[in-house]
Amino acid sequence: VFVAMAGSEESVKYAAHRGYSPLYFSSIERTAEFAKIYQKEAKKAGRNLSLGQNCAGVRWFAIGDTEKEAREKVLHHDADITKNFYSHFRKVAGRADSQDNSNAPLESWVDAFCQNPQNMVGTVSSIRDELVKAWKDNPLEYLCYIPHFAQQPKEDVIETIRLIQEEIKPALDELTQYESYEECA
C-alpha cells in the first residue's frame, strides 16, 4: 500500500509503523529527511529497513534529445496544467509566496514547472545524473512517474516510460540492492 504525503512528519511515522510505502511528493532534500524518519520509525515497529527501502519518490518527467526540446515538451504538455491546476494548491494552502499569475503567458509557466524540484526536465543523461546523485544519498526503492495523460500524447508517455525503464532505472537499481523483506523482520 502506498500512502501519498508531501510535508507531514506524522504521515511518515504513520506509514512506517504500519508497513505502508510512503509516496513522497516533495523535493529530493525533503524526501531524504523523510526517508531517515521512516527508517527510524520502521525499526521501532520491528522492521530493520535500509535507508530508502519501501519508499517512493514522485517525479514528473519531460525528456528530450536536448534541453530545449525538453522545455518545449513542458510548454506543450505541462504548462497549462501547472497554470490552471497546480498553481492553486499554493493559494489553498495559504502559502505566502503564492500570487495571482493567471494572466501570465503560458511560456512563463515553463520556468515555474522547471523550477519545481519534483519535475525532471532535460535529456536522459542529465536526468539520470541528477537522480543518481540523489540516490547515492537516499536510495529510494521506488520511483513513481506521473504523466499528464490528458495533455501529453500517449506515444510520448510510452517513450518516457521506456527511457526511464531502459536508460535511467538501471543506474538507480545499482544503488538499491536491499535485503529481502523476510530478512528485515
Give residue ranges: language-model regions.
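Short, acidic/polar
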Residues: 5-13, 126-133
